[in-house]
Regions:
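Short, flexible coil/linker segments at domain boundaries that flank nucleotide/cofactor-interacting
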Residues: 85-88, 167
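Long amphipathic alpha-helical segments
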Residues: 1-83
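Glycine-rich phosphate/diphosphate-binding loops that line cofactor/substrate pockets in enzymes
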Residues: 80-86, 131-135
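Alpha-helix N-cap/loop-to-helix initiation residues
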Residues: 34, 62, 98-99, 150
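Glycine-rich active-site/cofactor-binding loop and its immediate structural neighborhood
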Residues: 87-120
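Short acidic-hydrophobic, aromatic-tinged amphipathic segments that line or gate anion-handling sites
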Residues: 190-195
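A charged, well-structured terminal subsegment
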Residues: 202-214
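Cofactor-cradling patches in redox/metallo enzymes
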Residues: 109-112, 119-189, 202
Length: 214
């Protein structure tokens, strides 16, 4: 049985890394029909996407490769989607600019890791984050800034959460190419992530802290 499972997962991996969308989709459906667990399928897609992301960061893949891998990852998560209770809720968005790639990568990785993710999209402003926190009551707010001119928006968002009496009810995770750990501490954020895998680890750490009352 384990050998059959491994063969199904290998077929998914081979087609994923060859960017064969329809073949990967068919292999995924066969795996699920054969009894491979949805959790295991989702985990494989997560690992494959992280491998593609690493190749992109090493210069081995182009942005076109990464975009194709993202589409494959999204397809796999959709097919493997199970009705389970999310371990936490995250609101995510890009403050002030139209940059989306990094934010979308983290959104998919969070979903694969068991989080419910509310995506506010791009060109989001602090008021929209605050309104979403009031409406959705998330555990974590993940706000990205990709250009220096938008850095004040992260500070403003944290300040507005404080003024609304929401700051102690949610953990704030910030990131983006122009941010730093020092900046996160300066504005009063709870966590900072430089890269996507780090963002997932930070989200899990912050969720644990929230549940422990830290």
């Amino acid at each position: 049985m384990r050998q059959d499972t491994d063969q199904h997962l290998q077929a998914i991996g081979e087609n994923f890394l060859a960017f064969k969308y329809f073949e990967a989709e068919a292999a995924t459906k066969r795996a699920l029909a054969a009894g491979v667990s949805r959790e295991e399928v989702a985990k494989v897609f997560q690992g494959l996407f992280l491998e593609a992301l690493a190749r992109y960061e090493d210069g081995k893949y182009s942005i076109a490769h990464l975009t194709a891998a993202q589409s494959l990852f999204e397809m796999g998560l959709d097919l493997a989607k199970a009705k389970v209770t999310p371990k936490g809720k995250v609101i995510i968005g890009t403050l002030g600019s139209s940059h989306y790639l990094g934010k979308d990568i983290i959104r998919l990785l969070l979903a694969a890791d068991g989080f419910e993710v509310i995506d506010l999209g791009e060109i989001v402003f602090p008021e929209q984050f605050v309104e979403a926190v009031e409406r959705e009551k998330p555990d974590i707010v993940a706000a990205a800034v990709m250009i220096i001119a938008c850095l004040p928006l992260q500070r403003a968002m944290v300040g507005m959460l404080q003024l609304k009496g929401l700051r102690d009810k949610v953990k704030v995770l910030v990131g983006g190419g122009v941010t730093s750990e020092r900046w996160a501490a300066e504005i009063g954020a709870d966590g900072w992530a430089e890269r996507a895998p780090q963002a997932i680890a930070e989200a899990n750490r912050l969720l644990r802290e929230l549940k422990e009352g830290v």
